[in-house]
Amino acid sequence: MGESLDRCIDDINRAVDSMSTLYFKPPGIFHNAILQGASNKASIRKDITRLIKDCNHDEAYLLFKVNPEKQSVSRRDGKEGVFDYVIKRDTDMKRNRRLGRPGEKPIIHVPKEVYLNKDRLDLNNKRRRTATTSGGGLNGFIFDTDLIGSSVISNSSSGTFKALSAVFKDDPQIQRLLYALENGSVLMEEESNNQRRKTIFVEDFPTDLILKVMAEVTDLWPLTEFKQDYDQLYHNYEQLSSKLRFIKKEVLLQDDRLKTMSQYHPSSSHDVAKIIRKEKDEIRRLEMEIANLQE
């Protein structure tokens, strides 16, 4: 028994010595750049972990759906990726071989979705230029004429925007925001003059509308990462809003003090003028701080 144990220990020691002599390639440039050269290593590691991790059962059920007939898994928002294309290509190749048809050429194909997206972007740009020159529009928007009587989000939009558009179908402001999120901006007619239009970007919309859309995203796709990001952004928004309200109250208080002083001191002495200048400087400083917070 003792000899058998000594023999096992001896084998383990020889294996350890053998492994210690092996050469293992050091980490490459990409590994070093990601994990060692990043200023915020914790955030980078979190992103990489989120990218490669497997979904739990609840998250997978909310993001994907199973086709019992084809025994395939697809995204609930309808978007297809490389995996879906590879499965479809393999199915077509097997069917062609079974039917005796020649293989498709070239072997490497560009998914049809790439061409459709490019054509859609070109068509949208063309229609946008045409609408800008001709003055056409609908409900303050410049978008495809096929959308008359329907929502702002077109049929060629991704499933994410379609789902959000269905939730906020009765809110025109959020419909405009969704259109701007998908296309970068939206052209709107000014109320004072219907012949004039202005370009509205995403950052021009009220913050509470953007947070409302984000809250709905966390409800439709309740991933842990989405919820954490939303909670952090909402907390920052509440802090800035509270500080902004406090500064506005300070401005009103300073203004009331100036008015009171002007009523009780009609003769502008040197001291009163100095105090008034000081109060006005304080008001200007607070107004600049308000402008910085709003930006």
UniProtKB/Swiss-Prot annotation:
Subcellular location: Nucleus; Cytoplasm, Cytoskeleton, Spindle; Chromosome, Centromere, Kinetochore; Chromosome
Coiled coil segments of this chain: 223-295
Modification type Phosphothreonine: residues: 199
Pfam families membership: DASH_Spc34
Main location (coarse class): nucleus
Keyword Cytoplasm among UniProt keywords: yes
Protein's UniProt keywords contain Cell cycle: yes
One GO cellular component term: cytoplasm
GO biological process per UniProt: attachment of spindle microtubules to kinetochore; cell division; mitotic sister chromatid biorientation; positive regulation of attachment of spindle microtubules to kinetochore; positive regulation of microtubule polymerization; protein transport along microtubule to mitotic spindle pole body
Assigned keywords, A-Z: Cell cycle, Cell division, Centromere, Chromosome, Chromosome partition, Coiled coil, Cytoplasm, Cytoskeleton, Kinetochore, Microtubule, Mitosis, Nucleus, Phosphoprotein
InterPro entries xrefs: Spc34 (IPR013966)
Oligomer and partners: Component of the DASH complex consisting of ASK1, DAD1, DAD2, DAD3, DAD4, DAM1, DUO1, HSK3, SPC19 and SPC34, with a stoichiometry of one copy of each subunit per complex. Multiple DASH complexes oligomerize to form a ring that encircles spindle microtubules and organizes the rod-like NDC80 complexes of the outer kinetochore. DASH complex oligomerization strengthens microtubule attachments. On cytoplasmic microtubules, DASH complexes appear to form patches instead of rings.
Family to which the UniProt record says this protein belongs: Belongs to the DASH complex SPC34 family.
Free-text function comment from the UniProt entry: Component of the DASH complex that connects microtubules with kinetochores and couples microtubule depolymerisation to chromosome movement; it is involved in retrieving kinetochores to the spindle poles before their re-orientation on the spindle in early mitosis and allows microtubule depolymerization to pull chromosomes apart and resist detachment during anaphase.
Record protein name field: DASH complex subunit SPC34
Gene source species: Saccharomyces cerevisiae (strain ATCC 204508 / S288c)
